[in-house]
Every structure is written in structure tokens, then in C-alpha cells.
């Protein structure tokens, strides 16, 4: 992690490489079993698109089946899991909620925009980098909470210090 001054404020910053061979912004999560993840700035929930058995083998805990959620161009259903500790670069997500919904993508998971709520992030397609800046008002420890509102799942994100 490096530190930069933005408007006189020192902010933490890190950069992850994007896969140069893919048209969609995809990164490899060295800190999470080396899996690949696509960044989706329109996604509300993180989504596991690979086999659920693999997710369970990595320690994820099944919470509920047949959960309706919006995505992939409409409403669908999936199984809600919690990953005990998920890392993306310098960010840590304890008890990360993730929906498992099999899809034919060339990655194992989709990282949602809500995971980076309150942060400054840039998908630099020219240099193939994902740059994340963490303002002093935010933490590297991110807490995502899924709430059910009238049968629709939505997610809240807060940075919390441990």
C-alpha cells in the first residue's frame, strides 16, 4: 500500500493488475486462492458464478437457498453464502455475503460496485490496472450487509476499524 496526497489529505492507495487478454476488467486475486474476478460497476451484490462446491471448499458457509436478486439483465435466484474473510488487494471483507448463481463467464466471481462504496476507484484499461484510493474517512476493513426489503435483496457497505 502506498500513500498519496489528494487535496492536502494523505490517502492510502493500491493497484492491482488487470488481465490484458480479456475485454472485461478482470483481475486475479492472489490473496484469495488466485481466482479471477470481474469488476462490475453495475452490480449490487458480489456473485459467485463457478461451481458451489468449490466455494464451499474454500470455507464459505451456506446461509439460504433460492434467494431472488436482480442481475444479469433481470431477476434470478441464487444461494446466499458468507465467506469468512475475503481479501481484494489491501481491502478485507469479514463475513462477505455472496450470491452463488452459476453462469458461463470466464471468471469465478463478480466483484460488485458496492464493495468499493465510499472509495475512489479507477479501471485503467489503457495500462491494465485497477487503482483504489482509500480516503481517510474510510477503512481497509469493509463490512457488507445484505438486507431483505419486501423480498428484494440490497446491500449496505461500511468501512469499520478493528
Report each predicted region and the residues it spans.
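Pepsin/retropepsin-fold aspartyl endopeptidases
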Residues: 1-162
Amino acid at each position: 500500500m502506498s500513500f498519496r496526497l489528494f487535496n492536502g489529505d494523505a490517502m492510502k492507495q493500491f493497484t492491482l493488475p488487470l488481465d490484458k487478454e480479456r475485454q472485461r476488467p478482470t483481475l486475479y486475486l492472489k490473496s484469495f486462492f488466485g481466482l479471477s474476478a470481474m469488476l462490475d460497476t453495475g452490480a449490487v451484490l458480489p456473485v459467485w458464478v463457478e461451481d458451489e462446491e468449490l466455494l464451499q471448499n474454500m470455507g464459505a458457509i451456506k446461509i439460504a437457498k433460492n434467494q431472488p436478486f436482480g442481475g444479469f439483465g433481470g431477476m434470478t435466484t441464487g444461494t446466499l453464502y458468507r465467506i469468512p474473510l475475503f481479501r481484494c488487494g489491501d481491502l478485507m471483507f469479514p463475513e462477505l455475503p455472496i450470491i452463488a448463481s452459476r453462469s458461463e463467464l470466464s471468471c469465478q466471481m463478480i466483484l460488485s460496485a458496492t464493495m468499493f462504496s465510499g472509495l475512489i476507484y479507477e479501471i485503467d484499461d489503457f495500462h491494465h490496472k485497477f487503482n483504489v484510493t482509500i480516503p481517510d474517512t474510510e477503512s481497509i476493513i469493509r463490512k457488507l450487509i445484505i438486507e431483505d426489503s419486501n423480498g428484494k435483496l440490497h446491500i449496505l457497505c461500511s468501512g469499520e476499524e478493528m
